[in-house]
């Protein structure tokens, strides 16, 4: 798996104090495959998203689950109310592409592109008045 970088961006880049963020850089999965899973959890409550990721049979779900658990721990460390958290943003950006040549028939070679992703998950507390019943 890639390296997990935790950045406290509460004072810059438009992030607010009631948000928590975790970024996994250089994840060994194609951004297209990661986006399929991340689209499913965006906007959901944290508990629902964890359950959903546990039952999705994809590699991207395992990676996203680890990042989600990390961002939940960041929110807990920040003192946010875990019951009011929802996933505000879940994106997979393009990382670098590892290129290697594979020998083929008749003296040819073709390039294989191993795509890497940067996965970002942002949690935010729901406002007091907008509690779901």
Curated annotation (Swiss-Prot):
Keyword presence, Transferase: no
InterPro entries: Ribosomal_uL22 (IPR001063), Ribosomal_uL22_bac/chlpt-type (IPR005727), Ribosomal_uL22_bac/org-type (IPR047867), Ribosomal_uL22_CS (IPR018260), Ribosomal_uL22_sf (IPR036394)
SUPFAM superfamilies per record: Ribosomal protein L22 (SSF54843)
Extent of the signal sequence: none
GO terms for biological process, alphabetical: translation
Any one Gene Ontology cellular component term annotated for this protein: cytosolic large ribosomal subunit
CDD domains attached to this UniProt entry: Ribosomal_L22
The protein's role, per its UniProt record: This protein binds specifically to 23S rRNA; its binding is stimulated by other ribosomal proteins, e.g. L4, L17, and L20. It is important during the early stages of 50S assembly. It makes multiple contacts with different domains of the 23S rRNA in the assembled 50S subunit and ribosome.
Name this protein carries in UniProt: Large ribosomal subunit protein uL22
Organism: Aquifex aeolicus (strain VF5)
Lineage of producing organism: Bacteria, Pseudomonadati, Aquificota, Aquificia, Aquificales
């Amino acid at each position: 798996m890639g390296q997990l970088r935790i950045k406290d961006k509460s004072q810059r880049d438009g992030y607010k104090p009631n948000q928590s963020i975790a970024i996994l850089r250089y994840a060994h999965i194609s951004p297209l495959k990661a986006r399929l899973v991340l689209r499913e959890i965006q906007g959901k409550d944290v508990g629902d998203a964890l359950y959903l990721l546990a039952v999705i049979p994809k590699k991207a779900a395992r990676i996203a689950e680890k990042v989600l658990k990390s961002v939940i721990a960041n929110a807990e460390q920040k003192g946010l109310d875990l019951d009011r958290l929802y996933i505000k943003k879940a994106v997979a950006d393009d990382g670098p592409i590892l290129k290697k040549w594979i020998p083929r028939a008749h003296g040819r070679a073709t390039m294989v592109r191993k795509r890497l992703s940067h996965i970002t998950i942002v949690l935010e507390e729901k406002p007091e008045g907008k509690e779901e019943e």
